[in-house]
Amino acid sequence: MTNLGHNHPIAMKNRSVPVDTVLPHVAYRDLPTAIDWLVKHFGFVEQYHYVDTTTGKIAGAQLRLANAYIMAHASKANASTPAELGYSLQSLTIFFDDVDAHHRKVKSTGIRLVEQLHQTVYGELQYAVQDLEGHLWIFSQHAKDLSPDEWGAKITR
């Protein structure tokens, strides 16, 4: 096992951090409200949260939806939300086995869809919404197995 000169091997396991390839960290101005909103509207399950010992406020939480995990944390006081900026700099995509069912649940909460449920040219069935602070979320399901060159992309590897 490689350790690259550190005291900890790279393949170390940590039950507090899932083994996803990427663990997105999403900042919210009102973190407790955001956690409740993500649970209610998207179906996330809160795994744990932790408190800032100086303020006594929730500082971060790990949330899970299907096989995806995120860390939600409190933003800095002077940080703007995507909603305040009028745009989001990135999106988060979560994959489902049944995106239709998730789409029906999300629509039933009254959220405005940014992108209606549709099949993409690259073989995904997906839709998109913005959360309460303007972060862009895409919910997707593999609908077809397509090679990138089948829909016009140039394979470069």
Predicted regions and their residues:
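Vicinal oxygen chelate
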Residues: 2-25, 35-36, 42-97, 103-130, ...
